Amino acid sequence: MRGMGNMQGMMKKMQKMQKEMMEAQEALNAEQFEGVAGGGMVKVTVSGQREVVSVNLDESVVDPEDIEMLQDLIVIATNEALKKVEEKTNSTMGKFTQGLNLPF
Protein backbone atom coordinates (compact mmCIF):
# COMPACT_ATOMS: atom_id res chain seq x y z
CA MET A 1 0.00 0.00 0.00
CA ARG A 2 2.96 2.27 0.47
CA GLY A 3 3.36 2.67 -3.30
CA MET A 4 -0.20 3.98 -3.67
CA GLY A 5 0.57 7.09 -1.62
CA ASN A 6 3.59 7.75 -3.80
CA MET A 7 1.44 7.32 -6.91
CA GLN A 8 -1.16 9.75 -5.59
CA GLY A 9 1.56 12.27 -4.84
CA MET A 10 2.90 11.94 -8.37
CA MET A 11 -0.59 12.39 -9.82
CA LYS A 12 -1.09 15.56 -7.78
CA LYS A 13 2.25 16.93 -8.99
CA MET A 14 1.33 16.13 -12.59
CA GLN A 15 -2.06 17.83 -12.25
CA LYS A 16 -0.41 20.90 -10.73
CA MET A 17 2.17 21.00 -13.52
CA GLN A 18 -0.56 20.62 -16.14
CA LYS A 19 -2.50 23.53 -14.63
CA GLU A 20 0.64 25.69 -14.54
CA MET A 21 1.41 24.80 -18.16
CA MET A 22 -2.09 25.81 -19.25
CA GLU A 23 -1.81 29.11 -17.39
CA ALA A 24 1.59 29.79 -18.94
CA GLN A 25 0.23 28.99 -22.42
CA GLU A 26 -2.74 31.31 -21.90
CA ALA A 27 -0.43 34.12 -20.78
CA LEU A 28 1.81 33.51 -23.77
CA ASN A 29 -1.16 33.55 -26.14
CA ALA A 30 -2.22 36.94 -24.74
CA GLU A 31 1.20 38.51 -25.37
CA GLN A 32 2.08 40.44 -28.51
CA PHE A 33 5.44 40.44 -30.26
CA GLU A 34 6.76 43.03 -32.71
CA GLY A 35 9.07 42.55 -35.64
CA VAL A 36 10.72 45.56 -37.25
CA ALA A 37 12.41 46.06 -40.62
CA GLY A 38 13.72 48.93 -42.68
CA GLY A 39 14.97 50.86 -39.68
CA GLY A 40 11.53 50.87 -38.07
CA MET A 41 9.63 51.83 -41.20
CA VAL A 42 7.83 48.45 -41.24
CA LYS A 43 6.43 46.97 -38.04
CA VAL A 44 4.49 43.72 -37.77
CA THR A 45 2.81 42.65 -34.55
CA VAL A 46 1.83 39.03 -33.94
CA SER A 47 0.09 37.36 -31.02
CA GLY A 48 1.48 34.50 -28.98
CA GLN A 49 -0.83 32.32 -31.07
CA ARG A 50 1.23 33.29 -34.12
CA GLU A 51 -1.51 35.40 -35.71
CA VAL A 52 -0.69 38.72 -37.37
CA VAL A 53 -2.38 41.44 -35.33
CA SER A 54 -1.21 44.51 -37.21
CA VAL A 55 1.08 45.80 -39.94
CA ASN A 56 2.30 49.39 -39.75
CA LEU A 57 4.05 51.01 -42.70
CA ASP A 58 5.81 54.33 -42.87
CA GLU A 59 4.62 56.25 -45.93
CA SER A 60 8.17 56.50 -47.22
CA VAL A 61 8.39 52.73 -47.89
CA VAL A 62 5.26 52.70 -50.04
CA ASP A 63 6.73 53.15 -53.51
CA PRO A 64 4.56 51.90 -56.38
CA GLU A 65 7.74 51.52 -58.43
CA ASP A 66 9.32 49.16 -55.89
CA ILE A 67 6.64 46.91 -54.42
CA GLU A 68 9.16 44.06 -54.06
CA MET A 69 11.16 46.00 -51.47
CA LEU A 70 8.03 46.60 -49.40
CA GLN A 71 7.07 42.93 -49.64
CA ASP A 72 10.56 41.91 -48.51
CA LEU A 73 10.42 44.28 -45.53
CA ILE A 74 7.03 42.90 -44.47
CA VAL A 75 8.35 39.33 -44.70
CA ILE A 76 11.45 40.23 -42.67
CA ALA A 77 9.43 41.98 -39.95
CA THR A 78 6.90 39.13 -39.80
CA ASN A 79 9.60 36.48 -39.51
CA GLU A 80 11.34 38.47 -36.77
CA ALA A 81 8.11 38.71 -34.77
CA LEU A 82 7.42 34.98 -35.22
CA LYS A 83 10.96 34.17 -34.10
CA LYS A 84 10.36 36.15 -30.91
CA VAL A 85 7.19 34.14 -30.27
CA GLU A 86 9.08 30.89 -30.80
CA GLU A 87 11.91 31.92 -28.46
CA LYS A 88 9.48 33.00 -25.74
CA THR A 89 7.46 29.79 -26.16
CA ASN A 90 10.59 27.65 -25.86
CA SER A 91 11.85 29.48 -22.77
CA THR A 92 8.43 29.52 -21.09
CA MET A 93 7.28 25.99 -21.85
CA GLY A 94 10.78 24.53 -21.58
CA LYS A 95 10.66 25.11 -17.83
CA PHE A 96 8.03 22.41 -17.56
CA THR A 97 9.86 19.72 -19.51
CA GLN A 98 13.31 20.42 -18.09
CA GLY A 99 14.67 17.39 -16.28
CA LEU A 100 11.87 15.03 -17.33
CA ASN A 101 14.11 13.07 -19.75
CA LEU A 102 11.37 12.77 -22.33
CA PRO A 103 12.23 10.66 -25.39
CA PHE A 104 11.15 13.39 -27.85
Curated annotation (Swiss-Prot):
It is found in: Cytoplasm, Nucleoid. The keyword DNA-binding applies. Binds to DNA and alters its conformation. May be involved in regulation of gene expression, nucleoid organization and DNA protection. GO terms for molecular function: DNA binding. This is Nucleoid-associated protein Bsph_0039. Belongs to the YbaB/EbfC family. Transmembrane segments: none annotated. Pfam families: YbaB_DNA_bd. Homodimer. Its main location: cytoplasm. Keywords: Cytoplasm, DNA-binding. One of its GO terms (cellular component) is bacterial nucleoid. Residues 1-22 are annotated as: Disordered. InterPro entries: YbaB-like_sf, YbaB/EbfC. Residues 1-12 have a biased composition (Low complexity). It comes from Lysinibacillus sphaericus (strain C3-41).
